[in-house]
Amino acid sequence: MSSFVTNGYLSVTLEPHELTLDIKTNIRNAVYKTYLHREISGKMAKKIEIREDVELPLGEIVNNSVVINVPCVITYAYYHVGDIVRGTLNIEDESNVTIQCGDLICKLSRDSGTVSFSDSKYCFFRNGNAYDNGSEVTAVLMEAQQGIESSFVFLANIVDS
């Protein structure tokens, strides 16, 4: 995983009942709820600091809500194709094999190996190596996929040990 820090404006929408004396708290909560730990366009905001030293630009009324661009210092995280990651192998059935790596989900394609069911548990076979469901494996990221809520998703292949 790689990361970078940038200054930018994050756009949030506030409802009329949120425009009270607690507006700073409501803005902070809206920014965190909308952007923090959410995968958007291949990157995820891991840390957000709202800049108090910069004035807020005027809001815009859109459909009975107020859209505000909030000045922030944002630390983003992202993964590259070719990154090597380690995680837990999760086999739900023959067609759903994933590796869970914290904020990353690696999907294994059918041609990555074969799934077998023996002794009341699933096993994944690749190049003569057997990997039990729940075992720690290493994978190389092959292709980025559409993220899910708060996770990156990549197609990956297991690296043979």
Swiss-Prot record:
Protein EC: 2.7.7.6
Function, as annotated: Part of the DNA-dependent RNA polymerase which catalyzes the transcription of viral DNA into RNA using the four ribonucleoside triphosphates as substrates. Responsible for the transcription of early, intermediate and late genes. DNA-dependent RNA polymerase associates with the early transcription factor (ETF), itself composed of OPG118 and OPG133, thereby allowing the early genes transcription. Late transcription, and probably also intermediate transcription, require newly synthesized RNA polymerase.
Catalytic activity entry: RNA(n) + a ribonucleoside 5'-triphosphate = RNA(n+1) + diphosphate
GO cellular component: DNA-directed RNA polymerase complex; virion component
Pfam families listed in its UniProt record: Pox_RNA_pol
Family: Belongs to the poxviridae DNA-directed RNA polymerase 18 kDa subunit family.
Bridged cysteine pairs (disulfide): none
InterPro entries registered for this protein in UniProt: DNA-dir_RNA_pol_18kDa_poxviral (IPR004973)
BP GO terms, sorted: viral transcription
Class of the enzyme per the UniProt entry, highest EC level: transferase
Alphabetical keyword list: DNA-directed RNA polymerase, Early protein, Nucleotidyltransferase, Transcription, Transferase, Virion
Name the UniProt record assigns to this protein: DNA-directed RNA polymerase 18 kDa subunit
Keyword GTP-binding: no
Keyword field contains Transcription: yes
Subcellular location field: Virion
SUBUNIT field: The DNA-dependent RNA polymerase used for intermediate and late genes expression consists of eight subunits Rpo30/OPG66, Rpo7/OPG90, Rpo22/OPG103, Rpo147/OPG105, Rpo18/OPG119, Rpo19/OPG131, Rpo132/OPG151 and Rpo35/OPG156. The same holoenzyme, with the addition of the transcription-specificity factor OPG109, is used for early gene expression.
One MF term in the entry's GO annotations: DNA binding
